[in-house]
Amino acid sequence: MKEYRALLALLHLASPSLPIGAYTYSQGLESAIEQGLVRDETSAREWLVEMLGIFTDFELPILQRLLKAFSERDEAAVSFWTECFVASRETSEFRAETVQMGYSLAKLVIDLKLGDDSMRAILENQQAIPLPTAFACAAEALGIPHEESLLGMLFSMAENQVLACVKSVPLGQLSGQRLLLSLHPVIEACSIRASQLTDDELSSWAPGLSLLSMQHEVQYSRIYRS
């Protein structure tokens, strides 16, 4: 029964209906579509695999460390990795995205009184709360195993990107589901790799994505906030 509760909690946390505004962000994808880099199902899959790789090298290992820090109620470690992640956001849109979503999820954690008082206090004490920090706190509070938490965040990111592709390329619904299904083994492999990276191996190096984000800030016509 405990396992079922953890699964239900994971499905809830990774749900696109979670009111944190994920659907309003494309993480540079809208700019890539505008420039013709993503134009069909094949190029969309190439983009998604590349994005999952970027997540694997930095965001996911940070999440893993935050999960451990929250489980040990280690406020210093939570603050260190939180500040590290916020500092890694190269553009104003990327920083605003993660802080807005993190704030919204943190508010849910606090208002719903998830976890214990000490855990929520650590969350509230952060100057800026990016999404990985809020996600880690929520996952730990809900009793979701760390490995499943990594998979949940990756799948949630991939699903959001696929939905943006379906709306903006545009692609058909069948293409979108085919894309998402094809990413299952990629997500699993990325989760395993992320869990094995040492601190010295973490890297947020993605200059092309940063340039797309900067260009999106001045893009004439857009429907997404990043």
Swiss-Prot record:
GO terms for molecular function: nickel cation binding. GO terms for cellular component: cytoplasm. It comes from the Bacteria. It is found in: Cytoplasm. Keywords: Chaperone, Cytoplasm, Nickel insertion. Transmembrane segments: none annotated. InterPro entries: UreF (IPR002639), UreF_sf (IPR038277). Gene3D superfamilies: Urease accessory protein UreF. UreD, UreF and UreG form a complex that acts as a GTP-hydrolysis-dependent molecular chaperone, activating the urease apoprotein by helping to assemble the nickel containing metallocenter of UreC. The UreE protein probably delivers the nickel. Required for maturation of urease via the functional incorporation of the urease nickel metallocenter. Belongs to the UreF family. This is Urease accessory protein UreF.
